[in-house]
Structures are given as C-alpha cells and as structure tokens.
Amino acid sequence: RYLAICNPLLYSVAMSQRLCIQLVVGPYVIGLMNTMTHTTNAFCLPFCGPNVINPFFCDMSPLLSLVCADTRLNKLAVFIVAGAVGVFSVLTILISYIYILMAILRMSADGRCRTFSTCSSHPTAAFISYGTLFFIYVQPSATFSLDLNKVVSVFYTAVIPMFSPFIC
C-alpha cells in the first residue's frame, strides 16, 4: 500500500515477481514454524481422560486448559510468540501508514480527499482484526474466559473476513 500510494510510478519496478512471492511465502513459513512448535510441544503434554474442547475451533489456550501438568511455560511461549509477531506486524503496518499519511498530506486538497476516501477503510479493517487477535492471544490468564474467547474467535475468523471485501 505504501509503495502504491507514495510512489505509484515505481510500483511495477520495485514490486518484482520475486519480491511478491517472498511477501506471500514468508508469513506462511513463519506461521508454519510457529504452529509446528506449539503443536509439537502439545503432543508431549499429558492429558487427563476424555475431555471436550469448548471453543469455536481448537486453539492453543483451550487445549492447554485440558492438560494435567504445569503449562506455565507453554502459556508463556504462546504469549511471547503471539506478542512478538503481533507487535512486529502492527509496528510494520503503523510505520507504513505514517509514511502514507505524510505523503497524503503533501498532496493537493482534491487528491487528498480522494486518497482518504479510498484508503481509510483498510487501516480500519486491519486494526479491528489485530485488536481482536491481541485480545485473544495477549491477555493475562487471570482474565481468560472460554465463552468470551469463542465470541471473539468467531468475530476474527468469520465476521471480519466476510466484511473485508466491502471495507477494503
């Protein structure tokens, strides 16, 4: 978005096919490594008897609540990784939008109005999505609620993607 708005004439040169592939594959590789780490750790944990997972889908926090052993290290790992990925992602988007905002403020009044009307919905959708994800993954265990997390999970897995074509 930054390149398309701030330097539209350089977009096709800077966004090579190789870079586009890297930008798509990179998050998938990082997500796979993150998931495999937590999944491998979960296979090593002792579970007591038959249990039912209550949430909308099987997530790490509800799964850890079914373990018979101490899961503080696992919960800490989930918290640290989710926090680091979240902070890095949000900072990247925030810095990008600061540069975009500075470029928009240098435009003429007419161009500024058109750009704001075109681009303002994307940061809204991004920050709603990141806000719900932070709420789920980066919350103290004292405030953890399976029922509330189920509602928030439905929101960020179904509601936000459903409205994304209309917002963006």
Swiss-Prot record:
Localization: Cell membrane
Cytoplasmic side: 1-18, 68-75, 147-168
UniProt entry keywords in alphabetical sequence: Cell membrane, G-protein coupled receptor, Membrane, Olfaction, Receptor, Sensory transduction, Transducer, Transmembrane, Transmembrane helix
Transmembrane segments: 19-39, 47-67, 76-96, 126-146
Identification of the protein by name: Olfactory receptor-like protein HbT3
Function: Odorant receptor.
GO cellular component: plasma membrane
